[in-house]
Amino acid sequence: MDVRSYSDERLDFFGDELNRLFDSSRLECAKPLDVYDVVEFIGCSPDWKYITPDQSILGVTVFDQTPFYVWDKPIYERGDFPKEVILEKNTILIDRTLNEGNKQKQQIENFTVVHECFHWLLHKYYFENPENMLIQCCSEESLLGGWLKLNTDIGILEHQANRCAASFLMPHNAVVNEFMSVARMKHFPQQPMPLHKMKSHIAKTAKLFCVNFNPMKYRLQDIGLIQK
Protein backbone atom coordinates (compact mmCIF):
# COMPACT_ATOMS: atom_id res chain seq x y z
CA MET A 1 0.00 0.00 0.00
CA ASP A 2 1.24 3.45 -0.87
CA VAL A 3 2.05 5.83 1.97
CA ARG A 4 -0.12 8.92 2.10
CA SER A 5 1.80 12.08 1.33
CA TYR A 6 1.48 15.15 3.56
CA SER A 7 3.24 18.49 3.30
CA ASP A 8 5.12 19.73 6.37
CA GLU A 9 2.45 22.42 6.72
CA ARG A 10 -0.22 19.74 6.86
CA LEU A 11 1.75 17.76 9.44
CA ASP A 12 2.09 20.91 11.55
CA PHE A 13 -1.68 21.28 11.33
CA PHE A 14 -2.13 17.74 12.68
CA GLY A 15 0.09 18.59 15.64
CA ASP A 16 -1.82 21.80 16.33
CA GLU A 17 -5.17 20.06 15.93
CA LEU A 18 -4.33 17.50 18.61
CA ASN A 19 -3.38 20.37 20.91
CA ARG A 20 -6.70 22.10 20.18
CA LEU A 21 -8.57 18.96 21.15
CA PHE A 22 -6.37 18.03 24.12
CA ASP A 23 -5.64 21.47 25.63
CA SER A 24 -5.91 24.49 23.34
CA SER A 25 -4.05 26.76 25.77
CA ARG A 26 -0.85 24.85 24.90
CA LEU A 27 -0.88 26.59 21.52
CA GLU A 28 0.08 29.93 23.08
CA CYS A 29 2.32 29.13 26.06
CA ALA A 30 4.48 26.40 27.58
CA LYS A 31 2.61 24.20 30.05
CA PRO A 32 3.47 21.10 32.09
CA LEU A 33 2.50 17.96 30.20
CA ASP A 34 2.09 14.32 31.16
CA VAL A 35 2.46 12.62 27.79
CA TYR A 36 0.66 9.53 29.07
CA ASP A 37 -2.47 11.66 29.38
CA VAL A 38 -2.16 12.11 25.62
CA VAL A 39 -1.86 8.34 25.14
CA GLU A 40 -5.13 7.81 27.01
CA PHE A 41 -6.76 10.77 25.24
CA ILE A 42 -6.30 9.13 21.82
CA GLY A 43 -7.71 5.83 23.09
CA CYS A 44 -4.48 3.88 23.56
CA SER A 45 -2.91 2.15 26.56
CA PRO A 46 0.71 2.62 27.64
CA ASP A 47 3.03 -0.23 28.58
CA TRP A 48 6.69 -0.33 29.61
CA LYS A 49 9.11 -3.18 28.96
CA TYR A 50 12.79 -3.69 28.20
CA ILE A 51 12.33 -3.86 24.45
CA THR A 52 15.98 -4.55 23.65
CA PRO A 53 19.08 -5.01 25.84
CA ASP A 54 20.90 -2.20 24.02
CA GLN A 55 18.04 0.34 23.82
CA SER A 56 18.16 0.23 20.02
CA ILE A 57 14.35 0.43 19.97
CA LEU A 58 12.68 3.03 22.18
CA GLY A 59 9.02 2.77 21.22
CA VAL A 60 6.51 0.46 19.55
CA THR A 61 2.99 1.15 18.31
CA VAL A 62 0.74 -1.92 18.20
CA PHE A 63 -2.00 -1.89 15.55
CA ASP A 64 -3.38 -5.36 16.32
CA GLN A 65 -2.79 -8.12 18.86
CA THR A 66 0.57 -9.71 18.14
CA PRO A 67 3.34 -11.75 19.81
CA PHE A 68 6.50 -9.80 20.60
CA TYR A 69 9.84 -10.53 22.27
CA VAL A 70 11.06 -8.50 25.27
CA TRP A 71 13.89 -8.81 27.78
CA ASP A 72 14.06 -9.17 31.57
CA LYS A 73 16.72 -6.49 31.99
CA PRO A 74 18.24 -3.62 29.99
CA ILE A 75 21.76 -5.06 29.79
CA TYR A 76 22.69 -8.21 27.89
CA GLU A 77 24.62 -10.90 29.72
CA ARG A 78 25.78 -14.18 28.27
CA GLY A 79 23.00 -16.71 28.35
CA ASP A 80 20.19 -14.17 28.32
CA PHE A 81 17.27 -14.77 25.98
CA PRO A 82 14.17 -12.72 25.23
CA LYS A 83 10.74 -13.95 26.22
CA GLU A 84 7.56 -13.86 24.21
CA VAL A 85 4.64 -11.69 25.33
CA ILE A 86 1.37 -10.79 23.68
CA LEU A 87 0.89 -7.12 22.90
CA GLU A 88 -2.69 -5.94 22.63
CA LYS A 89 -4.07 -3.66 19.94
CA ASN A 90 -3.96 0.06 20.86
CA THR A 91 -0.82 -0.41 22.98
CA ILE A 92 1.98 2.13 22.94
CA LEU A 93 5.01 0.31 24.30
CA ILE A 94 7.91 2.37 25.67
CA ASP A 95 11.33 1.09 26.66
CA ARG A 96 11.47 0.99 30.46
CA THR A 97 14.89 2.61 30.60
CA LEU A 98 13.32 5.90 29.50
CA ASN A 99 10.81 5.76 32.35
CA GLU A 100 13.54 4.93 34.86
CA GLY A 101 16.07 7.52 33.73
CA ASN A 102 17.19 11.04 34.49
CA LYS A 103 15.72 14.34 33.26
CA GLN A 104 17.29 13.95 29.83
CA LYS A 105 15.81 10.47 29.49
CA GLN A 106 12.42 11.88 30.44
CA GLN A 107 12.68 14.42 27.64
CA ILE A 108 13.51 11.64 25.18
CA GLU A 109 10.57 9.68 26.61
CA ASN A 110 8.23 12.63 26.00
CA PHE A 111 9.18 12.84 22.33
CA THR A 112 9.07 9.07 21.88
CA VAL A 113 5.59 8.76 23.39
CA VAL A 114 4.09 11.55 21.30
CA HIS A 115 5.85 10.21 18.18
CA GLU A 116 4.15 6.85 18.77
CA CYS A 117 0.80 8.60 19.33
CA PHE A 118 1.01 10.07 15.86
CA HIS A 119 1.82 6.71 14.33
CA TRP A 120 -1.48 5.56 15.84
CA LEU A 121 -3.40 8.61 14.64
CA LEU A 122 -1.94 8.83 11.14
CA HIS A 123 -0.79 5.37 10.11
CA LYS A 124 -3.43 2.79 11.07
CA TYR A 125 -4.43 2.55 7.40
CA TYR A 126 -0.90 1.39 6.56
CA PHE A 127 -0.16 -1.09 9.34
CA GLU A 128 -3.63 -2.64 9.41
CA ASN A 129 -3.16 -3.63 5.77
CA PRO A 130 -2.55 -7.43 5.60
CA GLU A 131 0.53 -6.83 3.46
CA ASN A 132 2.31 -4.95 6.26
CA MET A 133 3.43 -5.66 9.82
CA LEU A 134 1.08 -5.13 12.77
CA ILE A 135 3.55 -3.02 14.73
CA GLN A 136 5.92 -0.13 14.12
CA CYS A 137 9.21 -0.13 16.03
CA CYS A 138 11.06 3.17 16.39
CA SER A 139 14.77 3.50 17.09
CA GLU A 140 16.56 6.45 18.64
CA GLU A 141 18.08 7.18 15.22
CA SER A 142 14.67 7.33 13.58
CA LEU A 143 13.37 9.63 16.30
CA LEU A 144 16.31 11.97 15.76
CA GLY A 145 15.70 11.80 12.03
CA GLY A 146 19.34 11.44 11.09
CA TRP A 147 19.04 8.23 9.08
CA LEU A 148 15.64 8.76 7.47
CA LYS A 149 15.34 7.97 3.78
CA LEU A 150 12.29 9.75 2.45
CA ASN A 151 12.16 7.47 -0.59
CA THR A 152 11.12 4.52 1.60
CA ASP A 153 7.75 3.87 3.22
CA ILE A 154 9.19 3.63 6.74
CA GLY A 155 11.34 6.72 6.27
CA ILE A 156 8.29 8.73 5.22
CA LEU A 157 6.18 7.41 8.11
CA GLU A 158 8.93 8.24 10.60
CA HIS A 159 9.33 11.76 9.21
CA GLN A 160 5.59 12.32 9.48
CA ALA A 161 5.45 11.15 13.10
CA ASN A 162 8.53 13.21 13.99
CA ARG A 163 7.14 16.38 12.43
CA CYS A 164 3.76 16.00 14.14
CA ALA A 165 5.38 15.25 17.50
CA ALA A 166 7.56 18.36 17.21
CA SER A 167 4.55 20.51 16.34
CA PHE A 168 2.53 19.11 19.24
CA LEU A 169 5.26 19.38 21.87
CA MET A 170 6.58 22.72 20.59
CA PRO A 171 3.62 24.63 19.10
CA HIS A 172 4.66 27.46 16.78
CA ASN A 173 3.11 30.40 18.62
CA ALA A 174 4.00 29.10 22.06
CA VAL A 175 7.64 28.58 21.07
CA VAL A 176 7.87 32.04 19.51
CA ASN A 177 6.30 33.65 22.59
CA GLU A 178 8.48 31.82 25.11
CA PHE A 179 11.74 32.09 23.17
CA MET A 180 11.32 35.81 22.58
CA SER A 181 10.55 36.28 26.27
CA VAL A 182 13.61 34.28 27.34
CA ALA A 183 15.83 36.15 24.86
CA ARG A 184 14.20 39.50 25.75
CA MET A 185 13.33 40.18 22.14
CA LYS A 186 10.60 42.74 21.51
CA HIS A 187 10.07 41.92 17.83
CA PHE A 188 10.45 38.90 15.58
CA PRO A 189 13.90 39.31 13.97
CA GLN A 190 14.12 40.28 10.31
CA GLN A 191 16.94 37.72 9.94
CA PRO A 192 17.47 34.51 11.93
CA MET A 193 19.75 35.03 14.93
CA PRO A 194 23.25 33.44 15.01
CA LEU A 195 23.12 30.01 16.62
CA HIS A 196 26.26 30.48 18.72
CA LYS A 197 24.77 33.53 20.43
CA MET A 198 21.45 31.85 21.20
CA LYS A 199 22.49 28.53 22.75
CA SER A 200 21.68 29.47 26.35
CA HIS A 201 18.28 30.81 25.28
CA ILE A 202 17.59 27.63 23.31
CA ALA A 203 18.43 25.52 26.36
CA LYS A 204 16.13 27.55 28.61
CA THR A 205 13.28 27.36 26.11
CA ALA A 206 13.78 23.61 25.67
CA LYS A 207 13.47 23.19 29.43
CA LEU A 208 10.15 25.06 29.42
CA PHE A 209 8.76 22.61 26.87
CA CYS A 210 10.34 19.50 28.46
CA VAL A 211 12.32 18.60 25.35
CA ASN A 212 16.03 18.24 24.67
CA PHE A 213 18.24 20.96 23.21
CA ASN A 214 18.41 19.59 19.66
CA PRO A 215 14.66 19.23 19.02
CA MET A 216 14.17 22.81 20.21
CA LYS A 217 17.08 24.01 18.07
CA TYR A 218 15.59 22.37 14.98
CA ARG A 219 12.15 23.80 15.78
CA LEU A 220 13.51 27.33 16.17
CA GLN A 221 15.47 26.98 12.94
CA ASP A 222 12.36 25.79 11.14
CA ILE A 223 10.37 28.74 12.50
CA GLY A 224 13.12 31.12 11.37
CA LEU A 225 14.25 32.48 14.73
CA ILE A 226 17.81 31.12 14.59
CA GLN A 227 20.23 30.31 11.80
CA LYS A 228 20.62 26.80 10.44
Question: What do the PLM-derived regions correspond to, one by one?
Answer:
Residues M1-K228:
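Active-site hotspot residues in diverse enzymes, especially metal/ion-binding acidic/histidine motifs
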